[in-house]
Amino acid sequence: MKVASIFLLTALVLMSLSGNSGANILGREAKCTNEVNGCPRIYNPVCGTDGVTYSNECLLCMENKERQTPVLIQKSGPC
């Protein structure tokens, strides 16, 4: 009984540590709006999954309109 309890506790700890770790590997989609007049000139950098730092999410969205494969946001801030 004691061995089973230790095994169960160890399994629960390992599962909680693994959690959602794979969700951030690819990145998240940019929140794109239909900017008719272009993007705002606000510097709020994001790092794309292509390794490029974009000045803001809007500029990443504009880049995605030109690409076949969309770039995701790997992290907030510069690459």
Curated annotation (Swiss-Prot):
Q: Which GO terms describe its biological process?
A: negative regulation of calcium ion import; negative regulation of nitric oxide mediated signal transduction; nitric oxide mediated signal transduction; regulation of acrosome reaction; regulation of store-operated calcium entry; sperm capacitation
SUPFAM superfamilies recorded:
Kazal-type serine protease inhibitors (SSF100895)
Keyword Secreted attributed? yes
- Residue(s) at site: Reactive bond for trypsin: 41-42
Keywords recorded for this protein, A-Z: Disulfide bond, Protease inhibitor, Secreted, Serine protease inhibitor, Signal
Q: Which GO terms describe its cellular component?
A: extracellular space
**What CDD domains does the database record attribute to this sequence?**
KAZAL_PSTI (cd01327)
Localized where? Secreted
Tell me the disulfide pairings in this chain. Answer: 32-61, 39-58, 47-79
Principal localization reads secreted
Q: Where is the signal peptide?
A: 1-23
Q: Where is this site: Necessary for sperm binding?
A: 43-44
InterPro entries to which the protein is assigned, alphabetical: Kazal_dom (IPR002350), Kazal_dom_sf (IPR036058), Prot_inh_Kazal-m (IPR001239)
| Domain Kazal-like positions | 26-79
Q: What GO molecular functions are on record for this protein?
A: serine-type endopeptidase inhibitor activity
Organism superkingdom: Eukaryota
Q: Which Pfam families match?
A: Kazal_1 (PF00050)
- Biological role stated in the UniProt entry: Serine protease inhibitor which exhibits anti-trypsin activity. In the pancreas, protects against trypsin-catalyzed premature activation of zymogens. In the male reproductive tract, binds to sperm heads where it modulates sperm capacitance by inhibiting calcium uptake and nitrogen oxide (NO) production.
Protein name listed in UniProt: Serine protease inhibitor Kazal-type 1
Q: Which organism is it from?
A: Bos taurus (Bovine)
Q: What is the lineage of its organism?
A: Eukaryota, Metazoa, Chordata, Craniata, Vertebrata
Write the gene name.
SPINK1
